[in-house]
Design a protein with these regions (language model features):
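Positively charged, aromatic-accented nucleic-acid-binding surfaces
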Residues: 1-49, 54-180
Length: 180
């Protein structure tokens, strides 16, 4: 493990509940944690590793598609110091590979990936139009708000939230003895 690069870690928070682990390398490259990528796209924690292995062997069901899209499958370990847990090693992928995995998961119909893709496009497209018309880009708060609304609309988060609230209210009524 002599070739492990030291990196700075930060949580890339798109909106409340949608985030990935981001890493900044000394050369300025940004990378994304494999585990947080899998979870953000609605998969189990080892999905990125399995996908990379499938591409490397040429036997994965999406190996050809990912290869055509330019997926490198290069996972690089990075070392982060100064966290509450001391020094940690994290496996990371490039932003380009992260983008290709979002596309793949969306193509497979994963709601989280479809919502992430829609929300990223929604925010990005508006910023490009603002620039074209000489307007200021969205602020971070505006981006997160716009992202949340697009994400929520795609996976109907608002309906799920309403259902959760209704369930909590029913439980509170039951506990209070007002369940008749």
């Amino acid at each position: 493990m002599d070739n492990i690069t030291r990196a700075e870690r930060s949580t890339v928070k798109f909106c409340e509940g949608v985030e990935v682990d981001g890493y900044l390398l000394p050369d300025g490259e940004f990378r994304v944690g494999k585990l947080s990528t899998a979870l953000a796209l609605g998969y189990g924690k080892d999905w990125v590793t399995r996908t990379i292995n499938g591409v490397a062997s040429g036997k994965g069901k999406d190996a050809e598609t990912l290869t055509q899209w330019g997926f490198t499958g290069v996972a690089s370990p990075v070392e982060v110091t100064g966290s509450a847990r001391g020094t940690t090693i994290s496996e990371t992928i490039s932003l380009k590979d992260f983008r290709q995995l979002i596309r793949l998961a969306a193509k497979r119909g994963k709601p989280q990936a479809e919502a992430l893709l829609d929300a990223l496009l929604d925010v990005g497209i508006e910023d490009w139009f603002r620039l074209a018309f000489g307007q200021e880009q969205l602020t971070l708060e505006e981006k997160r708000d716009k992202f949340y609304k697009a994400y929520a609309a795609t996976i109907d988060w608002l309906l799920e939230d309403r259902q959760d609230i209704r369930l909590i209210e029913e439980q509170e009524l039951f506990l209070a003895g007002n369940w008749n």
